[in-house]
């Protein structure tokens, strides 16, 4: 229905103003009906009886002139004689609605309280209802006999100037209110329009241009969070570009090497060299296969909504299986693996946890000096599960330590890994609501510590 927020707020505000005016009118009408109507009736009845008392004491020659004089004093009067003849004085009534029964009762000396007894009407205020049944009436004794006199104040005449003033006041009130509503709506919508333009810039890839935070209300909070979102999206875009560059480099280098080996393979007839080239190509393709596998795993971890973490895992047995699987690689370097494992159960994703712990052991074997030792420990600590793996090897600089868990980061340029192992491990541990930390002692003993919640209860 509304194509703009500006129109929606303006229409809603104007509707509220008009609806409030209507409700106020109805409530005022109710207040008059239940609180003022009876006292108003009594005041007018008192005035009419005082007029009768004066007429009886003063004995004016022409009773009609007397009523005419009352009419000129802003009263509306209707007289009815015993023959049913009606005479009106003052401003005319809008409608003659008085019943014959009411007239007969007054002629029989019974007072008429039409103002007090006026039925309630929701949208008609009895105070202003200019009809003959909305009057008070009493019997007047004249030389020509009894007459019924009905009277009410001429509200229109009495309040004509005030009514004009009130009408002007209401018109100005509505005009100023609506003008202020439109102006205030524009002040609300203007920053929203700026946000819209800023989102369009984001769609076009502009993550550098901030929007000025001009307010401290909800709009200002929205502006603040928009700027934070813009910064985050800019960082994500930089990471994406960096990721694409790294993947391109990791794939391009081995493909170039394979291309070179295939050229050499075509040009040589030496069986020994040909076999060496084939072995090298096989090694490189194996590395490429590992890279694609890890890239797919990273993508799975980034879009983890479908992953389940309800496997009942015997963690100590899982570590033993990993050690047994990597024992051959450790034996090739004459490494000793010492494991102190408590029997611990954990609820999580066994495939992913196996991958994370395997990465740490493979790294430890890779970077431990020949003849060295690797220490593995698993234990309870309060409400947590603590896993540590330590090994002695070459020291790592503080700069390298700070970037250790970045994707594609390699401590050494001569490292033949793809730099994804620790990044994958960190993502897996965090998906299990755990943490991983790296520490290094003065004796160049490096330690990875994984802390997981004890959720097996």
Swiss-Prot record:
Disulphide-bonded residues: none
Transmembrane domains' residue ranges: 9-29, 164-184
Coiled coil ranges: none
Modified residues (Phosphohistidine): 249
Compartments, record wording: Cell membrane
Pfam families named in the record: HAMP, HATPase_c, HisKA
Residues in Histidine kinase domain copies: 246-456
Annotated SMART domains: HAMP (SM00304), HATPase_c (SM00387), HisKA (SM00388)
GO molecular function, one term: ATP binding
Cellular component GO terms, alphabetical: plasma membrane
Protein name, entry field: Heme sensor protein HssS
Catalytic activity: ATP + protein L-histidine = ADP + protein N-phospho-L-histidine
Domain HAMP, first and last residues per copy: 186-238
Species this protein is from: Staphylococcus aureus (strain JH9)
Enzyme class: transferase
Location (main, coarse): membrane
Alphabetically ordered keywords of this record: ATP-binding, Cell membrane, Kinase, Membrane, Nucleotide-binding, Phosphoprotein, Transferase, Transmembrane, Transmembrane helix, Two-component regulatory system, Virulence
PTM section of the record: Autophosphorylated.
Membrane topology: Multi-pass membrane protein
Primary role: Member of the two-component regulatory system HssS/HssR involved in intracellular heme homeostasis and tempering of staphylococcal virulence. HssS functions as a heme sensor histidine kinase which is autophosphorylated at a histidine residue and transfers its phosphate group to an aspartate residue of HssR. HssR/HssS activates the expression of hrtAB, an efflux pump, in response to extracellular heme, hemin, hemoglobin or blood.
Keyword Metal-binding: no
EC number(s) on file: 2.7.13.3
The keyword 4Fe-4S belongs to this UniProt entry's keyword annotation: no
């Amino acid at each position: 229905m509304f194509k703009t927020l500006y129109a929606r707020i303006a229409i809603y505000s104007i509707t509220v103003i008009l609806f409030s005016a209507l409700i106020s009118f109805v409530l005022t009408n109710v207040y008059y009906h239940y609180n003022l109507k009876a006292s108003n009736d009594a005041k007018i009845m008192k005035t009419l009886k005082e007029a009768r008392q004066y007429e009886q004491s003063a004995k004016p020659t022409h009773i009609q002139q007397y009523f005419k004089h009352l009419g000129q004093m802003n009263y509306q009067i209707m007289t009815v004689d015993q023959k049913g003849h009606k005479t009106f004085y003052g401003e005319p009534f809008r409608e003659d609605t008085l019943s014959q029964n009411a007239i007969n009762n007054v002629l029989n000396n019974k007072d008429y309280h039409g103002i007090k007894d006026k039925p309630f009407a929701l949208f008609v205020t009895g105070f202003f209802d200019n009809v003959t049944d909305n009057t008070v009436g009493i019997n007047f004794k004249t030389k020509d006999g009894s007459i019924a006199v009905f009277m009410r104040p001429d509200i229109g005449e009495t309040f004509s100037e005030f009514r004009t003033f009130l009408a002007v006041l209401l018109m100005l009130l509505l005009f100023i209110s609506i003008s202020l509503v439109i102006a205030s709506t524009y002040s609300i919508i203007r920053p929203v329009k700026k946000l819209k333009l800023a989102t369009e810039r984001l769609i076009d890839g502009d993550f550098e241009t901030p929007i000025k935070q001009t307010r401290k209300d909800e709009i200002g909070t929205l502006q603040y969070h928009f700027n934070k979102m813009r910064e985050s999206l800019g960082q994500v875009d930089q990471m994406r570009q960096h990721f694409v560059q790294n993947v391109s480099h990791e794939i391009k280098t081995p493909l170039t090497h394979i291309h070179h080996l295939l050229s050499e393979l075509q040009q040589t007839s030496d069986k020994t060299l040909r076999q060496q080239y084939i072995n090298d190509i096989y090694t490189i393709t194996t590395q490429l296969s590992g890279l694609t596998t890890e890239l797919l795993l990273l993508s799975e971890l980034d879009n983890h909504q479908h992953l389940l973490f309800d496997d009942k895992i015997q963690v100590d047995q899982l570590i033993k299986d990993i050690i047994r699987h990597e024992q051959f690689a450790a034996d090739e370097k004459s490494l000793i693996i010492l494991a102190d494992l408590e029997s611990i159960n954990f609820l999580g994703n066994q495939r992913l946890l196996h991958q994370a712990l395997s990465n740490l052991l493979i790294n430890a074997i890779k970077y431990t000096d020949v003849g060295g030792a690797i220490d593995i420990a698993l234990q309870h600590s309060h409400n947590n599960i603590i896993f540590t793996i330590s090994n002695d090897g070459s020291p790592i600089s503080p700069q390298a330590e700070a970037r250790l868990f970045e994707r594609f980061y390699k401590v050494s340029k001569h490292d033949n890994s793809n730099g994804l192992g620790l990044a994958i491990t960190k993502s897996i541990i965090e998906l299990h609501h755990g943490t991983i930390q790296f520490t290094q002692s003065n004796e160049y003993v490096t330690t990875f510590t994984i802390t997981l919640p004890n959720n097996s209860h």
